[in-house]
């Protein structure tokens, strides 16, 4: 699904088990139908799969939920947001990728904000305010407010945090920026 490789299931379990923090697993794998339920059996709090990597979305979402996990559905930039709508009532999170998945440090794709706006309207119309609308990719102090104003409420900030001189301070600044935009 993506050209690079990070952790296999066993290594992921070690990391998840060692953490006292809630863990969100975002699977960028070729066969989410198999991997989703396997990762749902770990101590992770939530498991997000990609629509594009799943042959039977309803079955896979149900299998993850059956393990007591929060369930997320992600889409790549080239995938229409409409594919998510039939599953909204089964989800705890909709993830809109704002870069092509696979590598950090890419530029934020502003054109994805129309998808975020559409998803936010659906969630409000269907009274699903507890479903998180997440962005992943190119999140920084310059882009987080754009995403928040479009309707996103949850953000994955990789390079902005890990390449900063003070990662903890950067997390605080990103949170403050997003919260200001959400007011």
Regions found by a protein language model. Give the residues of each.
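N-terminal active-site wall of soluble small-molecule enzyme domains
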Residues: 1-63
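Glycine-rich phosphate-binding active-site loops on the catalytic face of alpha/beta enzymes
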Residues: 47-56, 95-107, 150-170
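Hydrophobic faces of well-ordered beta-strands that scaffold small-molecule active sites
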Residues: 23-27, 47-49, 71-75, 94-96, ...
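Conserved, mostly hydrophobic/aromatic
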Residues: 39, 94, 119, 136, ...
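Alpha-helix-loop-beta-strand connector modules within alpha/beta enzyme cores
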Residues: 5-25, 63-72, 112-133, 174-183
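Active-site beta-loop-alpha junctions enriched in small/polar residues
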Residues: 28-32, 52, 76-78, 99-100, ...
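Catalytic cores of alpha/beta
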Residues: 33-41, 79-91, 138-155
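Glycine/Thr-rich beta-alpha phosphate-binding loop at enzyme active sites
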Residues: 1-6, 10-11, 77, 85, ...
């Amino acid at each position: 699904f993506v050209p690079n490789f990070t952790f296999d299931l066993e290594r992921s379990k070690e990391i998840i088990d060692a953490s006292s923090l809630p863990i969100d697993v975002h699977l960028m794998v070729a066969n989410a139908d198999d991997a989703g339920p396997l990762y749902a059996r770990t101590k992770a709090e939530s498991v997000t799969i990609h629509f594009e990597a799943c042959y039977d979305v309803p079955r896979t979402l149900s299998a993850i939920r059956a393990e007591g996990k929060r369930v997320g559905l992600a889409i790549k930039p080239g995938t229409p947001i409409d594919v998510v709508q039939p599953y909204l009532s089964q989800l705890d999170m909709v993830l809109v990728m704002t870069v092509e998945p696979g590598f950090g440090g890419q530029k934020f794709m502003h054109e994805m904000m129309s998808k975020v706006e559409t998803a936010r309207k659906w969630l409000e119309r269907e009274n699903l305010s507890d479903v998180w609308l997440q962005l992943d990719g190119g999140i920084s102090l310059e882009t987080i407010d754009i995403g928040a104003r479009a309707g996103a409420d949850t953000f994955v900030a990789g390079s902005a945090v890990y390449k900063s001189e003070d990662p903890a301070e950067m997390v605080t600044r990103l949170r403050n920026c997003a919260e200001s935009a959400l007011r």
